[in-house]
Amino acid sequence: MIRRPPRSTLSSSSAASDVYKRQEDNPEVIYAVYSSSDYSFHGIYKSIDGGDNWSLQSNSPNILGRDTDGTGTGGQSWYDLSLGVSNNDENHLFVGGINLWESTDGGANWTIEASSGNGNYAYMHVDQHCLEFHPITNVPYAGNDGGLYKYLDNLNNWIDISDGLEISQFYKLGLSESNASRLIAGAQDNGTEMLTNGVWDAVRGADGMECAIDPYDEDLLYSSSQYGGLRKSFNGGNNWDNIKPVSYDGAWVTPYKIHPNNNNMIVAGYDEVYLSLTSGAVWDSISYNVSGGQSVRTIALAPSNEDYIYAATYSRVKKPTNTGQSWTSIKPGLPNYNISDVTVSDNDPNWLWVTMSEYNASNKVFESSNGGATWTNITGANLPNLPVNCIVYQANANEDLYIGTDIGVYHKDNTMSDWAPYKNGLPNVVVNELEIHYPTNRIRAATFGRGVWDSPLNSSSTYTNYNIVNNLNIYPNPASNRLYVKLKSSDLVHFEIRSISGKIIKEGTLAYNNYIDVSRINSGTYIIKIRVGNSLYRQKISITQNSR
């Protein structure tokens, strides 16, 4: 057991975070790094008698701060603080905070070793969490928010050896309804990543947060950075426009949603709820003091009715009582715990569920069938006593629910009396968001530390395009006069042709093997939506007209 340096040994009683490391070749040698109450460098201490006595080695420069020259105040040792001691040289140390620092004289003097900036030091991702020397080779390794790094002595450099490790810390993800191989996800310290046909590409920097893909156009992307830096791309992530509705910050993960049946409608939560009916070009505040001074943490939209919007802070859940700025609290009846997520039935705007991110075994998931007037606790007895981070509703006959917890996914439907694990093959990992890809009947999970995972749904949805896609033929493409819609069955076909911005250009109903007259539609790229019963299919089409 290591005896910590007594407070009388420290230069101040305000020391905060700390980390200890014993030297392998001489276990009597122990180092301790302390941070101050503002998370700056408080000091490094050394013991040569197994922890009975300690001496201060140094308390400057500020090796836990952001500045690579050690000036400045503060740091973030509450999040990143690490210490490594060479196995065969007790005076060779590394300390990691935001950056990585090195000492070769037992902590008396320090030089910057690595950071993410440009300077006279090696490149390394910021936020250092662990440091270890290999027990045989004595090669140092560093683990940070960017992955795992190894020191190359012959090059005096650090290299990223994370390739192939599925360790991204994702907060949120967005799926493409029209392209099953595309998704976009926001990662801690690694920006916004986009997956297309099995290949990941970085499309934005900073800390990646909430993401979305337009349901009609896979190249129309939305992403956000920390505190609500909301942006939009029209060309698959090559360029981004700022569409943030306010100049000030929202929550760390600021919520926003695109309405599933109206891609022009976006709702975002900052201090208030903001609505855009122009895909983010123009915003209006639609609430007043809805957050009570807090930041809105989650937004839920009712697919069946655009007037139903639910917004929640950690301690409040509200919905609008009309299309104006009057909102009603629906928190009464819920326990006084942090709210993590809200989801709404696809068919009934008053049927919703709320989850709690608390360590309280009996208060995890709540259901309301009357718009929050009353609540039913559906936590059951099988859930682990860990935070529930997210919930998603599957529109089908069994009314499946899926929740993401700190150790994976759990599932319940209307035939089950309690929740059951739904994580075969999934590591025990924090699941921050779940989204359903209806065209392929699959569910995808954004995890904090193990990347993005994919699984078949428990039961098929009636809302899937694969019932018709193999029997459907839309031609010619491009078209000029007639666009033929051929279906092997004799079912009635409902169609919509929309502009890329979502405006309905033409809609109607077709009988078996018929065509749409597009002769009066201007040349351009459009989205055609075909609905047959409960099945839906979307496709890009081009219309080319001769000069007239």
Regions found by a protein language model. Give the residues of each.
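Short, small-residue-biased leader/transition segments that mark boundaries at the very start
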Residues: R4-V19
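Asp-box/BNR beta-propeller loop motif
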Residues: S14, S37-R66, N99-M124, D145-S168, ...
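Short coil-to-beta transitions that initiate beta-strands within beta-rich domains
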Residues: S14-S17, R66-S86, S116-H134, I161-S178, ...
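Surface-exposed coil/turn segments at beta-strand junctions on protein surfaces, enriched
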Residues: D25, N88, N261, S304, ...
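Entry beta-strands of beta-propeller and related beta-repeat scaffolds
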Residues: N26-A32, D89-F94, T137-Y141, N179-L183, ...
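Active-site lining segments of carbohydrate-active enzymes
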Residues: S35, G50, S60-H92, I98
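A recurrent domain-boundary module in secreted/ectodomain proteins
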Residues: N432-T462
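C-terminal outer-membrane/trafficking sorting elements
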Residues: N467-Y475, A479-R548
